[in-house]
């Protein structure tokens, strides 16, 4: 089953001086589902925090989309499911959107460092691929 890649995987893949870069690049090369939210969040981080130019952002997003097994849209059903996850599991709304999109994409794993490693949402498991390489 295809894993779902959270925004931080894309961000670390773009940071060549970060020890997590090599792991993130391998994950990105292997492919995985993402959502439109992940693309949007990366564009925002790349522009505001990394100070990338728009052409560089567009090039990275084109690369990400080409390697991704699937880009999950954000539909009303995603929004509604995220509201339920946020309410019932005490997670932030944007994390709940990631969970909802991953489930809609048919993923069994979310690769992220933003949620508790090993936490389960039904058949979906949160995995932090950066545990051993955190600075």
What label would you give each PLM region?
Residues 99-135:
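Acidic, PIN/NYN-like endoribonuclease modules and their adjacent C-terminal/linker elements
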Residues 1-35, 49-59, 133:
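Short, well-structured N-terminal submotif of metal-dependent ribonuclease cores
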Residues 6-8, 41, 95, 114:
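Acidic active-site catalytic centers that drive phospho-/nucleotidyl reactions
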Residues 70-113:
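Active-site neighborhoods of divalent-metal-dependent phosphate/nucleic-acid chemistry enzymes
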């Amino acid at each position: 089953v295809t894993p779902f890649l959270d925004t931080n995987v894309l961000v670390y893949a773009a940071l060549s001086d970060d020890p997590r870069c090599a792991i993130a690049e391998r994950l990105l090369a292997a492919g995985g589902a993402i959502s439109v939210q992940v693309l949007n969040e990366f564009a925002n981080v790349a522009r505001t925090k990394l100070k990338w130019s728009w052409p560089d952002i567009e090039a990275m997003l084109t690369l990400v989309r080409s390697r991704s097994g699937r880009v999950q849209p954000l539909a009303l059903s995603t929004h509604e499911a995220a509201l339920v996850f946020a309410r019932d599991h005490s997670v932030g709304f944007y994390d709940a959107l990631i969970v909802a999109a991953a489930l809609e994409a048919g993923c069994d794993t979310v690769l992220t460092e933003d949620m508790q490693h090993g936490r389960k949402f039904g058949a979906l498991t949160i995995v932090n691929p950066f545990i051993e390489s955190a600075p």
